[in-house]
Amino acid sequence: MELSEHEEDAGDVGGGCSSPPTPPHRVLTSAAPETIRCRYHECLRNHAAASGGHVVDGCGEFMPASTEEPLACAACGCHRSFHRRDPSPGRAGAARLPQLHLPASINSRAPPALLLPPAAAASKQGLPFPGYGTPSGGTGTTTASSSDERLRPSPVQPRRRSRTTFTREQKEQMLAFAERVGWRIQRQEEATVEHFCAQVGVRRQALKVWMHNNKHSFKQKQQQENRQEQQQ
């Protein structure tokens, strides 16, 4: 009785009724998303762009102003986008690409053309696309000096102050006012100074600077005129 059961099992195996092999399956695994911490260095904002010059404020590194305004720099007050962005120092980890896992049977039967040596694979990835990176469409590569020149900040140039120009009538009125107050603005005369500036059309700070710059020259000129009158 037991012999007949074994014979039936053997007949089932040899009859060709076995289930077909399962097709190879691919399993894609990707690493958890890793945050890239970027670091922002010196401020590259051109404060003299309106006048055609190039002046930076000299801020060396971005510092958040507060939790309410995290994108404003506490040192220079500029937006974070004006600072040079460098993701490499604060990078938490290299981004991992999805890995392709194949069954061992498929990897063992892979054609030789798909299994490239490490050196050949690296050289193949390093070749640029034709027509990209060179004017002639060749296979030239860009040098590291060009990228360094873009990232290198320009030297800080001294900011030129715009000089205020006065008309001849304004100079005569300011000279008469300066001689009347003794070439010195007192605190008791603030109302008089404000009224004079509004009447002549000059700013108070401009009047103060003009009196400071021309005080000695006009006094020397007046002294010379007095000496000439006494000699005559």
From Swiss-Prot:
Write down the InterPro entries for this protein, in alphabetical order: Homeodomain-like_sf, Homeodomain_ZF_HD, ZF_HD_homeobox_Cys/His_dimer
ZF-HD dimerization-type zinc fingers: which residues?
40-86
Cross-referenced PROSITE patterns: ZF_HD_DIMER
Annotated site residues (Required for DNA-binding) in this chain: M211
Protein location: Nucleus
Q: Where is this region: Disordered?
A: 1-25, 126-170
Regions of compositional bias (Acidic residues) in chain numbering:
1-11
Q: Which one Pfam family would you cite for this protein? A: ZF-HD_dimer
Domain commentary: The homeodomain differs form the typical one by having namely 4 instead of 3 extra amino acids inserted in the loop between helix 1 and helix 2.
Annotated function: Putative transcription factor.
The protein in question is named Zinc-finger homeodomain protein 5
